[in-house]
Every structure is written in structure tokens, then in C-alpha cells.
Amino acid sequence: TAPNADTLYTTAFFDVGKEPWVLSIPDMKGRYALFPMLDGWTNVFQVPGKRTTGTAAQTYAITGPGWKGTLPAGVKEYKSPTNIVWLLGRIYCTGTPEDYAAVHKLQDEFKLVPLSSYGRPYTPPAGSVDKSIDMKMSVRDQVNKMSAVEYFTLLSQLMKDNPPAAADAPELARFARIGLVAGRDFDASKLKADFAKRIPEVAFDRIM
């Protein structure tokens, strides 16, 4: 999939595991825009925008799969199937300097804050760096360095907070044969040593 040539992107990654996040979209004044929300598996679960919800100002609370609670008046709930959420917004732009400025002004009016900070000034906390991760190494190379057990152990932890879709049940049944079950720790005893060694070769053969 190629990036759009006639839109400017507005994107964010956030975790709704601890609490919902609230997205405030300004009045787009009829301008075409869409704001797909993707779960941890990049499945789109909601798409507010001109075609679906119009261009007036609107506010949404993106909640996690296990969240239950009350939202402020005027805030609509969008429930994410996973804790990890990717907002991948696109706003139409003609490409002229004047329209770039107009879209940038709209982008500056967007707000994305934790529910506990909604309606109040919010300053994101300083980020932290995991020093155990080589930030100069590509993701592909980092994954390729992992053993099969390391990879499936990490995947099982991620699947606890980011459950696979129900439509993936047939594949999940196959994964269980090697000890990978959604919601549980990885059972390395079910992964045969000879198969673990062959996994990189099998993966490469399937891709090629």
C-alpha cells in the first residue's frame, strides 16, 4: 500500500490498557478527511471522517477491550479490540502553500489525551528509552536475531493484551500445537528442537 499523494497524515500510537484516550477532531469545514483506527494487528475497527461521521467537530474515547465506565457528555465510545491502537488520519490538501498552511492549522487543533486529563491542560510525560534495545538496528534484524523460543515468548506476552481476532481461530488452533496459545505464557516444551532450528528457513521459503 502506497501513501496518499494528496493528503497530509496525522498519526499517533497509544496504549488504552490503563485507561481510554480521548480524540478531539476539530471542525473540518467540509474538507475531506478520514481517521482510521487500527488495532494491534492493523485491523481497522473504526473510521470517523467525512464519509462516515461528517466534518463537524467530534470527540471520541478509544477504550480498551476490558474497559467499563462512564464517559463525559458528548464523548462517543469506540472500543478497540486490543490495547495497542494506531491512529492513521489523512486530510485532503491541494498541495498549494496556502492549503498546506490551512491543513497544518487544522492539525494543530487536534487533541489526544488520556481520559483522566480530558478537559484540562495536558503535557505528555517525558519518554523513556529501553537501553536493552539497539535503536540503530532495524526491526527486521532484531527479529532475525531472536531464537524461536524468544520470539514466541514475546509474541505470547503481546497477545495477552492484544488478543487476536475471532476470525483467526483456525490459525490459532494450529499455533497451539507448538505451545502458542493466546492469553497464556508460551509453552516451550511443545516446540520441538529440530523444528525450532528450521523456523527461519521455513519462514524464508514461504516468503520467497
PLM features per residue range, with description:
Residues 1-208:
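A compositional/structural signature for long, glycine/proline-rich flexible linkers
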